[in-house]
């Protein structure tokens, strides 16, 4: 069988026999062998041979290409596809500006440990280094933000490179990889020998070892001894599908559980053991708990600054158990007393298995009672229903009306309110946490909807961040993706304004978005997307419910109170106990309070640290 061009059928090749085909056809066959069923991308000159082969692959029915309106959106969609499914996301882009447009999305995936294979076109091999039209060194540009990258110099290497790329992207700590393919490599005919997934091991590559029983047992010993333990769960628990083992461990030892922004969904936030999210905009009770715990059990979390606040005051009385797959994270920000290195799913399953061989005697009753006191005293507050709609009301309405939806978010105040008030299952919360990429939400919703066509997908956005990738309304319309985009519209860059109010003496430099803001509903309709504007509290539930039930893509523009701030908040440089925006309790009798000897502040008797200055009480 001799294939003479990329436009010849690429599917159905013999599993092992060499075939004479083009590099582009070989690439598509390699992707098929790795189970790729969806590709997000945007064509251009250097990648046209690959798109020619993709056209044939689509006609065979094994893959679907989603044409985005901007390459950055393609990376975010592939990212969310991976987060929603646990599979590797795939996106295409051409050389030059097409490739550089991918960079923000690659960095977003890298910061959040998302497996993704990014394939770029490149100028022909003889033109590399000549400043040819649309030539950029995307290999060099992306080196700091990928796990590995390749420039394909010989089409015969394509099968092996694709196999390595998928292995590296998905193994260990997941992350993005990049394959840069010169145009003439895609065109060249050669004897293609198919390479099966997992059959090529890159040099120096090592699969994570199973967890050591000694480390697991040592961690279990500390849990059994602790009186004030706290499970601190990050995104690694979701990547490892460890939520069932996590739940069993928490229930068996009655461990309270807090999650990071990336860890939302790893543990049921409706469970009495949940204390919600911790950190800068976490719940007061999560931040008090981490400050007073005597054992911190970190699961797939990296002790980042938005979680820890002032690092040397983070969990100051606690011993630390760290479950982690990436050895570079052990001891990076916080020394671990016991480190359990390995796949989190295997590690937690093994811990549950060993625990069942012991008698579980939880010692946390008094600790849970204290946490419940904090929950009662410092709940997430909802302002009184008067005047303009409050942002929190919008999120509570979404929670009531779409409790099982996959939620994606943009970045800003709306993201934090969503994290505080929504309750999501595993892989049901998709947000840019590490890089904080504005414009992530709508493309991510596209990717999640393509991945999960039978699930409801809701994007929570701000009026500033939605404009970063507003053109993707065209993608929603073109493919009929029934995503619901809820804009929490306060006509500000809300988080920037809040910081300017709090820390820059109310100098609102370049954060007011009132002038020049589009009519979002008219804009959506111009793309062929339905839209509804909500400004009246009395109509919020009715109109939101109708929009969420629509079978078509819909934009919902909810105008909210302009000056509302997101609280609680840990100010920069402060400890987690030094939150601002907590509800006051003037009714407290002196007999139930403590006075801080450092700053004189009066606080509840059950506190061990002063919420004003962070001093030990």
Swiss-Prot record:
Pathway info = Amino-acid biosynthesis; L-isoleucine biosynthesis; L-isoleucine from 2-oxobutanoate: step 1/4; Amino-acid biosynthesis; L-valine biosynthesis; L-valine from pyruvate: step 1/4
For this UniProt entry, the molecular function terms from Gene Ontology, in alphabetical order, are: acetolactate synthase activity; flavin adenine dinucleotide binding; magnesium ion binding; thiamine pyrophosphate binding
Keyword Nucleotide-binding in the entry? The reply is: no
Q: Keywords of this protein's UniProt record, alphabetized? A: Amino-acid biosynthesis, Branched-chain amino acid biosynthesis, FAD, Flavoprotein, Magnesium, Metal-binding, Thiamine pyrophosphate, Transferase
> What's this protein's name?
Acetolactate synthase large subunit
Superkingdom: Bacteria
Which Cys pairs are S-S linked? Answer: none
One GO biological process term: L-valine biosynthetic process
Gene it is expressed from: ilvB
**GO terms for CC?**
acetolactate synthase complex
Documented EC number(s)? 2.2.1.6
Q: Which residues form a coiled coil?
A: none
Matching entries from Pfam families are given as:
TPP_enzyme_C, TPP_enzyme_M, TPP_enzyme_N
Question: Which cofactors does this protein require?
Answer: Mg(2+); thiamine diphosphate
Q: Where does Mg(2+) bind?
A: 463, 490
What is its quaternary makeup? Dimer of large and small chains.
Q: Where is this region: Thiamine pyrophosphate binding?
A: 413-492
- Which residues take part in binding thiamine diphosphate? 71
């Amino acid at each position: 069988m001799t294939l003479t061009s990329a436009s010849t059928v690429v599917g159905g090749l013999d599993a092992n026999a060499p075939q004479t085909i083009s590099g582009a056809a070989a690439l598509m066959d390699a992707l098929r062998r790795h189970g790729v069923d969806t590709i997000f991308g945007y064509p251009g000159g250097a990648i046209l041979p690959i798109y020619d082969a993709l056209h044939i692959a689509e006609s065979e029915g094994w893959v679907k290409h989603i044409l985005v309106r901007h390459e950055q959106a393609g990376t975010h969609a592939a990212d969310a596809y991976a987060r929603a499914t646990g599979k590797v996301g795939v996106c295409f882009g051409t050389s030059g500006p097409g490739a550089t447009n991918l960079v923000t999305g690659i960095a977003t995936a890298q910061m959040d440990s998302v497996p993704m294979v990014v394939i770029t076109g490149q100028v022909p091999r003889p033109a590399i280094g000549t400043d040819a039209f649309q030539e950029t060194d995307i290999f060099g540009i992306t080196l700091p933000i990928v796990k590995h990258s390749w420039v394909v110099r010989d089409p015969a290497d394509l099968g092996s490179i694709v196999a390595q790329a998928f292995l590296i992207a998905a193994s260990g700590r997941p992350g993005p990889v990049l394959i840069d393919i010169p145009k003439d490599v895609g065109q060249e005919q050669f004897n293609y020998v198919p390479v099966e997934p997992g059959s090529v091991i890159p040099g120096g590559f090592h699969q994570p070892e199973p967890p050591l029983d000694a480390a697991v047992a040592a961690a279990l010993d500390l849990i059994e001894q602790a009186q004030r333990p706290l499970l601190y769960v990050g995104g690694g628990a979701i990547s490892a599908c460890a939520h069932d083992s996590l739940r069993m461990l928490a229930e068996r030892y009655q461990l309270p559980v807090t999650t990071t922004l990336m860890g939302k969904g790893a543990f049921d936030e409706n469970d009495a053991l949940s204390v919600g999210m911790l950190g800068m905009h976490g719940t007061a009770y999560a931040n008090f708990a981490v400050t007073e715990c005597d054992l911190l059990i970190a699961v797939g979390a990296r002790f980042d600054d938005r979680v820890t606040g002032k690092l040397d005051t983070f969990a100051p009385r606690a011993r630390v158990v760290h479950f982690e797959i990436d050895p570079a994270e052990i001891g990076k920000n916080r020394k671990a007393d016991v480190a359990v290195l390995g796949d989190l799913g295997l590690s937690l399953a093994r811990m549950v298995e060993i625990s069942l061989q012991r008698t579980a005697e939880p010692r946390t009753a008094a600790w849970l009672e204290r946490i419940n006191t904090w929950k009662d005293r410092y709940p997430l507050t909802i302002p009184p229903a008067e005047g303009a709609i409050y942002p929190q009301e919008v999120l509570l309405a979404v929670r009531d009306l779409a409790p099982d939806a996959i939620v994606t978010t943009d970045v800003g105040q709306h993201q934090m309110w969503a994290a505080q008030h929504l309750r999501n299952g595993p892989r049901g919360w998709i947000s840019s946490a590490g890089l904080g990429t504005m414009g992530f939400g709508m493309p991510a919703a596209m990717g999640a909807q393509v991945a999960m066509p039978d699930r409801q997908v809701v994007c929570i956005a701000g009026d500033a961040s939605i404009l970063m990738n507003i053109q993707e309304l065209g993608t929603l319309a073109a493919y009929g993706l029934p995503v619901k985009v809820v804009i929490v519209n306060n006509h500000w860059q809300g988080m920037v304004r809040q910081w300017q109010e709090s820390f820059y003496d109310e100098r609102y430099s370049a954060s007011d978005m009132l002038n020049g803001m589009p009519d979002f509903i008219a804009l959506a309709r111009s793309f062929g997307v339905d839209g509804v504007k909500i400004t009246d509290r009395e109509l919020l539930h009715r109109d939101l419910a109708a929009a969420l039930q629509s079978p078509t893509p819909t934009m919902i523009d909810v105008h909210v109170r302009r000056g509302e701030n997101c609280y609680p908040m840990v100010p920069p440089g402060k400890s987690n106990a030094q939150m601002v925006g907590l509800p006051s309790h003037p009714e407290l009798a002196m007999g139930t309070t403590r006075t801080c000897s450092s700053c004189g502040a009066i606080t509840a008797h059950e506190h061990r640290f002063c919420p004003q200055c962070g001093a030990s009480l």
